[in-house]
Amino acid sequence: MVKLRLKRVGKKFHAQYKIVAADARSPRDGKFIEELGHYDPHAKKLTLNKELLTKYLDQGAKPTDTVRTLLKQEQFYSNYIASKK
């Protein structure tokens, strides 16, 4: 099963995260399928590749709770769900 989740990168005490599509069994910072965006919690900056996100969500990938919250803040997830109805 494919999950959309955060992969930690950056320096110690200054974490940044990549939003990736990864197998649910792989470790947090391990192998991933594709990078879909990145998030800097210190600068509150979120960058998304909306075409790739839509592709993986259409194929059945499940976002983790944190990624779902970030997508809702960008109004991406609610727009995606509304377009599916």
From Swiss-Prot:
The keyword Transmembrane helix does not apply. One of its GO terms (molecular function) is structural constituent of ribosome. Gene3D superfamilies: 3.30.1320.10. Disulfide bonds: none annotated. Keywords: Ribonucleoprotein, Ribosomal protein. One of its GO terms (biological process) is translation. InterPro entries: Ribosomal_bS16, Ribosomal_bS16_CS, Ribosomal_bS16_dom_sf. Coiled coil: none annotated. It holds the Pfam family Ribosomal_S16. One of its GO terms (cellular component) is cytoplasm. NCBIfam families: S16. HAMAP family: Ribosomal_bS16. Belongs to the bacterial ribosomal protein bS16 family. This is Small ribosomal subunit protein bS16. It comes from Metamycoplasma arthritidis (strain 158L3-1). The gene is rpsP.
